[in-house]
């Protein structure tokens, strides 16, 4: 140990008598006990005298420290046996108290085990100062051996490093490698997990375990302080090079574990250091590291903090940093920072002042007939409207050939049905919205026995009036009322009257007498209003946004009752169109698009609503001009389309002169076209009949690498079909799909997509329809056309070349050589005018979006339809029969297979064994089947918005026969016509990436099925797995026990 600048060593061969050694140990122990007793007795009388005695005792015991540390001078207890010493860390004293002499403190061992000391080696012993509080160690177990703690010996030439381990469970100085540190054995009391324990006990135990980290953090801060202030006192005579040899500070100390620093000047730092040096001289310590620390030492500001601080960064740097960080986003799942998606470009409609002026005039008068002051302006609008009419006629003509006839056909329903219907159509698909309305109609049915009292009941004001029939006088009053003050609607910017007496207008336009049957309500809206919001929310919960929609619907119904006394809006059919528009816009939750839907589809007004499908199609077909896209974005790269209101502002001034029937068919065809072909993502451009006039297709065609390929190169592989489902199905029970559709040939498809075959079951000879038919079958027979009568769609190559040239100009490729452009524009056949479609990872996924079946067409007088409602004469679809395969169950989504080893002599009882059930059905001469109901017949011809939710060839699967099939004789299927049935979740998923011919045949000769229908409860159901299983619900884990 270092004492007064000298080093104590033991020479080789020097020995001592054991008795003399024990005597000295007893004397030192006795002297220390006496010193402590004298210290306690004289503490109150004379502090100076106490300090002198203490100082003399420390000098006397200084020489014996090394002996006690090495274990040669152990203290003995009353029995004479050596007593184990306790060693503690340095004490941290409070302000105003003097530290204890380090020579009188008891030392603490650092190493784990006692090591034999070599006599020839030179060792240095590092004493450690006592802590102010006693540490309580856990009690040892009876069978546990007592471990001895000895002093840690270090080679003098090794470097002493004082540092702290941040957030370590065992904190302390970093010792040289190869030496182990002592660790306190932790005992975990598992009773604390069962019994409640006070918080203060837990905190006290943790504080005892981690007390060393706080001490050594302060020692590290003091060492850092010495390192920074040594240049200020380098000339001090008591600090020599020999004493500084052991003072090596680690530069990598952690600073943020040090307690908060106070603001002091550099003079206070030097003055405090001088006090420490004086203490070192008075007590004869070897270095400043041996001086005990005070609490105030940790609060002194270091010398580095006295120096001038760095200037604060400028605001621009901070703003730049914020901007850079703003481009990053945190992924909560991965907890990593990734680049944010690029900001999507939103297109804007190029609205000229003349269009905006014409729009404002039409919103005020709502009449297309007006006179222009300038003949040139009138001629300009007339020319533009003629051009638009030509393009609209072309679109309707092609869509009629592909998607069938969609002209206006009246459905039953009231105005209230349509208003609630547009509430349910907002921000969702037609499938979910139609299901929601069907659920409401099933929950609150109309009681036909109570009759027309609810519908015919007139308000008291109307009964007391002398006449409620429209006359010239009443109409003139309305015209005078319309010339009052105007105001601007915040929703649409329409100039409107400030005050309108709706009660007076309602009495004026309400017709006398009963309401016709076509305008009856489909739902008992009075019961809906009285049921409460919770009941309505539960009814439409599957639709989504049920809380907001239920609140709006009930508010609308309550407002009608509060204002008019009943729920009746049939007077809007007779009111002027501009007043109807204003009345609808004043309903909370009804916007311009919803109001136009009610007017066009429910009231047959002259209007044209623009929804997401219509707006996207109008932009892609070039009906609406756009402002130049920034950053070189092409049309096919556009994701965010202009707002629907801006598109309607451009379209309506040019469509206002078209007839109402044309506007209805145009809207209906556009809605279906947007679901089948022109979808938002992955549109089916290669099968689209409008690709020759499409700006989107031309842009994608120019940007693709296929542009400069030779015509001989094939873009897509021909369509291929697989064989039958399974070898277990007999060959005579299956037939090729070409008996049902003419799309089997490999050259009919432009895309490389594999389709599963349609299984025709059972196989029966095709019989001709008898010539003599009943009068009931006449409309049924006229509905269906032969395959040869399906119209063929023309392809305009000249229009496509013109679109490609325009796309080349926009993309900037016209600067290329004329040879390259001529090669690009060589399109000999429509089949080569295709764009590459990135194939999906799993081609089977698109195949599983639809399930194809072969069904039989049932006449209206068929024996199997006795328990079903009579088909509506104006329903374009018939009843259908889907046959079950032998061994098939309602939950089967894979073809049945043979499950037993029977040879036919003895049949098994397994439900899904195709072999045994085929023999049973053949021996019994029976079939099992499911009935499919036409949608118009299932809804009894009543649905809001004139039934535009459904497709013209849509059918519902009977839920009862889907679970428990009907069993009938095989003779009942003879002579029935076979058709194709496409089942799926939505119309978009069914037609995903189908070729043009198959889509055309599906609309003209096939049928669609999206849902099942419960005839008793009259509410929609999901299709059973046998008819269709979504891709996400396929696999072994979804199979039932019968299918395994």
UniProtKB/Swiss-Prot annotation:
EC number: 3.2.2.-
Binding site for [4Fe-4S] cluster: 678, 685, 688, 694
Record's compositionally biased regions (Polar residues): 1-15
Residue spans of biased composition, Basic and acidic residues class: 16-30, 54-66
Segments of skewed composition (Basic residues): 38-53, 71-89
Cofactor entry: [4Fe-4S] cluster
Signal peptide: none
Subcellular location: Nucleus
GO BP annotation list: base-excision repair; chromosomal 5-methylcytosine DNA demethylation pathway
Molecular function terms, GO-annotated: 4 iron, 4 sulfur cluster binding; DNA binding; DNA demethylase activity; DNA N-glycosylase activity; metal ion binding
SUPFAM superfamilies: DNA-glycosylase (SSF48150)
Region (Disordered): 1-107, 1024-1044
Primary enzyme class: hydrolase
Gene3D superfamilies in alphabetical order: Helix-hairpin-Helix base-excision DNA repair enzymes (C-terminal) (1.10.1670.10)
A Gene Ontology term for the protein's cellular component: nucleus
Chain spans, region DEMETER: 348-445
Superkingdom: Eukaryota
Stored Pfam families: Perm-CXXC, RRM_DME
Chief localisation class: nucleus
More details: Although strongly related to DNA glycosylase proteins, it differs from these proteins. The DNA repair function may not exist.
Family of this protein: Belongs to the DNA glycosylase family. DEMETER subfamily.
Domain remark in the UniProt entry: The DEMETER domain, which is present in proteins of the subfamily, is related to the J-domain, but lacks some important conserved residues.
Main function: Potential transcriptional activator that may act by nicking the target promoter. Catalyzes the release of 5-methylcytosine (5-meC) from DNA by a glycosylase/lyase mechanism.
Name of this chain's protein: DEMETER-like protein 3
Gene: DML3
């Amino acid at each position: 140990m270092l004492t007064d600048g000298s080093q104590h060593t033991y020479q080789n061969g020097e020995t001592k008598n054991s008795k003399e050694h024990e005597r000295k140990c007893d004397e030192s122990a006795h002297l220390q006990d006496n010193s402590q007793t004298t210290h306690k007795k004289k503490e109150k009388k004379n502090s100076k005298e106490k300090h002198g005695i203490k100082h003399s005792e420390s000098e006397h015991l200084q020489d014996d420290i090394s002996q006690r540390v090495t274990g040669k001078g152990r203290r003995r207890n009353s029995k004479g046996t050596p007593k184990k010493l306790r060693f503690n860390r340095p004490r941290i004293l409070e302000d105003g108290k003097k530290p204890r002499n380090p020579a009188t403190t008891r030392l603490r061992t650092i190493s784990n085990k006692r090591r034999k000391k070599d006599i020839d080696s030179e060792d240095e012993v590092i004493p450690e100062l006592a802590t102010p509080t006693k540490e309580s160690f856990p009690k040892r177990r009876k069978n546990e051996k007592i471990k001895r703690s000895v002093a840690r010996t270090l080679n003098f030439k090794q470097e002493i490093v004082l540092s702290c381990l941040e957030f370590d469970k065992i904190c302390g100085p970093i010792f040289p490698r190869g030496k182990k540190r002592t660790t306190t054995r932790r005992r975990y009391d598992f009773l604390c997990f069962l019994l409640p324990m006070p918080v203060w006990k837990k905190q006290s135990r943790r504080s005892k375990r981690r007390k060393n980290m706080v001490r050594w953090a302060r020692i590290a801060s003091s060492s850092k302080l010495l390192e920074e202030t040594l240049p200020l006192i380098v000339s001090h005579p008591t600090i020599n090079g020999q004493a500084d040899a052991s003072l090596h500070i680690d530069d990598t100390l952690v600073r943020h574990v040090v307690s908060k620093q106070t603001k002091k000047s550099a003079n206070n730092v030097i003055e405090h250091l001088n006090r420490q040096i004086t203490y070192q001289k008075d007590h004869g310590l070897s270095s400043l590291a041996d001086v005990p620390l005070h609490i105030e030492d940790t609060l002194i500001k270091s010398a580095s903090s006295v120096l001038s601080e760095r200037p604060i960064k400028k605001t621009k740097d901070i703003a730049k940093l914020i901007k850079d960080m703003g481009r990053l986003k945190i992924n909560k799942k991965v907890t990593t920072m990734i680049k944010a998606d690029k900001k999507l470009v939103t297109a804007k409609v190029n609205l000229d002042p003349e269009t905006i002026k014409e729009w404002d005039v039409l919103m005020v008068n709502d009449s297309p007939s007006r006179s222009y002051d300038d003949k040139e302006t009138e001629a300009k609008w007339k020319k533009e409207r003629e051009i638009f009419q030509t393009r609209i006629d072309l679109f309707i003509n092609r869509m009629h050939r592909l998607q069938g006839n969609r002209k206006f056909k009246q459905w039953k329903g009231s105005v209230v049905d349509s208003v609630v219907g547009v509430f349910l159509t907002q921000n969702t698909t037609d499938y979910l919205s139609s299901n929601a309305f069907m659920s409401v109609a099933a929950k609150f049915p109309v009681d036909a026995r109570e009759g027309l009292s609810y519908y015919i009941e007139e308000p008291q004001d109307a009964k007391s009036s002398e006449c409620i029939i429209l006359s010239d006088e009443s109409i003139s009053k309305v015209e005078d009322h319309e010339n009052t003050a105007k105001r601007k609607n915040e929703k649409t910017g329409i100039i409107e009257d400030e005050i309108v007496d709706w009660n007076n207008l309602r009495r004026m336009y309400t017709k006398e007498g009963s309401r016709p049957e076509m305008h009856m309500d489909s739902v008992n809206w009075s019961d809906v209003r009285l049921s409460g919001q919770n009941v309505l929310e539960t009814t439409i919960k599957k639709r989504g946004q049920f809380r907001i929609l239920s609140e709006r619907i009930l508010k609308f119904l309550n407002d009608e009752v509060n204002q008019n006394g009943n729920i009746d809006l049939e007077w809007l059919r007779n009111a002027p169109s501009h007043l109807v528009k204003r009345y609808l816009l004043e309903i909370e939750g009804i916007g311009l698009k919803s109001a136009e839907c009610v007017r066009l589809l429910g009231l047959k007004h002259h209007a044209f609503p623009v929804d997401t499908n219509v707006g996207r199609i109008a932009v892609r077909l070039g009906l609406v001009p756009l402002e130049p896209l920034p950053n070189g974005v092409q049309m096919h790269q556009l994701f965010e389309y202009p707002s629907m209101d801006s598109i309607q502002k451009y379209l309506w001034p040019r469509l206002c002169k078209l007839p109402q029937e044309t506007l209805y068919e145009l809207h209906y065809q556009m809605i279906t076209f947007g679901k089948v072909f022109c979808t938002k993502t992955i549109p089916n451009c290669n099968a689209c009949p409008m690709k020759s006039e499409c700006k989107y297709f031309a842009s994608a065609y120019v940007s693709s690498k296929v542009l400069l390929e030779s015509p001989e190169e094939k873009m897509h592989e021909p369509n291929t079909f697989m064989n039958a489902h399974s070898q277990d199905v007999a060959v005579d029970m299956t037939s090729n799909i070409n008996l049902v559709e003419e799309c089997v040939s490999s050259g009919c498809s432009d895309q490389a997509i594999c389709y599963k075959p349609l299984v025709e079951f059972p196989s029966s000879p095709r019989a001709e329809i008898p010539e003599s038919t009943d009068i009931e079958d006449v409309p049924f027979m006229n509905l269906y056309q032969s395959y040869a009568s399906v119209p063929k769609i023309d392809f305009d190559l000249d229009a496509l070349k013109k679109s490609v040239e325009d796309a080349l100009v926009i993309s900037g490729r016209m600067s290329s050589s004329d040879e390259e452009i001529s090669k690009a524009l060589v399109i000999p056949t429509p089949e080569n005018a295709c764009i590459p479609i990135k194939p999906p990872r799993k081609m089977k996924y698109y195949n599983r979006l639809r399930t194809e079946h072969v069904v039989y067409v049932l006449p209206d007088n068929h024996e199997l339809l006795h328990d079903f409602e009579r088909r509506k004469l104006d329903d374009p679809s018939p009843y259908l029969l889907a046959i079950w395969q032998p061994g098939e169950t309602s939950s089967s989504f894979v073809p049945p297979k043979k499950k037993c080893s029977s040879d036919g002599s003895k049949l098994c009882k397994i439900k899904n064994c195709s072999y045994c059930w085929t023999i049973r059905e053949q021996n019994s001469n029976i079939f099992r089947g499911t009935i499919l109901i036409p949608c118009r017949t299932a809804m009894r011809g009543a649905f809001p918005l004139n039934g535009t939710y459904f497709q013209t060839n849509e059918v519902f699967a009977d839920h009862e026969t889907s679970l428990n099939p009907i069993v009938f004789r095989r003779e009942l299927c003879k002579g029935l016509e076979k058709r194709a049935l496409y089942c799926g979740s939505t119309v978009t998923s069914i037609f995903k990436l189908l070729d043009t011919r198959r889509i055309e045949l599906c609309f003209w000769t096939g049928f669609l099925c999206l849902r099942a229908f419960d005839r008793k409860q009259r509410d929609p159901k999901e299709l059973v797995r046998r008819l269709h299983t979504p891709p996400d619900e396929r696999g072994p884990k979804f199979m039932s026990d019968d299918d395994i």
